[in-house]
Every structure is written in C-alpha cells, then in structure tokens.
Design a protein with these regions (language model features):
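Thiol/disulfide oxidoreductase modules built on the thioredoxin-like
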Residues: 116-121, 127-179
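A short beta-strand-turn-helix
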Residues: 42-68, 135
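Short active-site neighborhood of thiol/selenol oxidoreductases, capturing the structured segment around
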Residues: 59-81, 87
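N-terminal targeting signals for export/organelle localization
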Residues: 1-49, 179
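Extracytoplasmic
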Residues: 45-47, 63-65, 97, 119, ...
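Structural microenvironment flanking redox-active thiols in thiol-disulfide oxidoreductases
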Residues: 81-119, 129-134
Length: 179
C-alpha cells in the first residue's frame, strides 16, 4: 500500500512543480527582477517596426526619430499595477518620448479597466505578436518588461520586471544623451 501511495505522490508533486520559476498566472509566465540592461550605442541592434491596433480601437505607428518607451504589461500582473502610475507620470514629464504599452495574455475588457483605473493616456498595442520580432535582441522576457528604443530605432535598454520612476527616468536620460 505504501509503494502504491508513493507511486501516486511522486507524479503529483512533479506535476505541481514550476521548476523554480516564479509563476504569475496560469500560463506560468516569469516575473522579472527589475534588472536594467543598457546597451552602448555602438552595440545596439535595430528594433522591429512598431505598429498595430491599439486598445482604444485606433492604430499606432512609431514616429521616426523619437525615443520610445515600450512597456509589456497585463492587468493581472501585480508588478504591472505597481509600476503603472510611474509610467503614466513619466509619459507626462517626457512629452518628447513616445510611451507605448503592449498588452499580452489578457482580455480586452480587463485591459480597458486597467487603463481607466490607472488613467493611462498613452496607447497600448493589443497584438503582442510584435514581441516575437525582438528575437535575438534584448527580448521582452518577463511581465512586465520595459524596452527603450533610441531615436535611431535601435534597442537601447531593457528593464525586466517592475520599473521605478527614478530608474526609468535615468535610463531615458542616458538614451537621450547618448543619441
């Protein structure tokens, strides 16, 4: 009987394991740790063309020559909720920078409620297939992830995990001054 129960217990324990990853939802997406990566100008690679349908029903196309802060988010993500006010404040403090959200693994109803709750004024793409186009670069590897694309259209920085106002502002200034 003990061998039988042990035989049932082992597969149960293994099936419940996440392999040490931090699961943030049923799809077992990884939560970032807030580490920022800055790429020197000479080592940057071109970002893919950034365009697509937005949460408000419009279409977005990146403005050439503008620095872009691209934030990958979802309404169910608690670090996304924590960083939303800082992102909105920075978008107002830096009108010369284009802020853009990329909704991932979420419903449009929940996402619209999130945008309304946090009074997010910048657009959010609803087609997260754009994230696949960053393959081979500083790919968005967690939710949330924030990328900064320089005015030349190259990926300049990434924060994997929740951003803070001061950390993101410092990176924006570094990217702008390194143009």
């Amino acid at each position: 009987m003990k061998k039988f129960l042990l035989g049932l217990l082992i597969p149960l324990v293994v099936s419940c394991s996440t392999g040490g990853a931090i699961s943030t939802n049923e799809q077992s997406f990884i939560a970032g740790n807030g580490v920022a990566t800055f790429i020197p100008k000479a080592e940057r690679k071109a970002a893919p063309a950034i365009s697509g349908p937005t949460l408000d029903g419009g279409n977005f196309e990146a403005t050439p020559g503008k620095v872009i802060v691209l934030n990958v988010w979802a309404s169910w993500c608690s670090p996304c909720r924590a960083e939303a006010p800082a992102l909105q404040e920075l978008s107002v403090a830096h009108p010369e920078v284009q802020f853009l959200g990329v909704l991932t693994r979420d419903s449009l109803v929940a996402a619209r409620a999130f945008v309304e709750r946090f009074e997010i004024k910048y657009p959010s793409l609803v087609d997260d297939s754009i994230l696949l186009k960053f393959h081979g670069q500083l790919t968005p590897n967690a939710i949330p992830t924030t990328l900064i694309i320089d005015g030349s259209g190259n990926v300049a920085a990434r924060i994997s995990g929740e951003v803070t106002y001061s950390a993101l502002e410092d990176l924006i200034e570094r990217v702008k001054s390194n143009e």
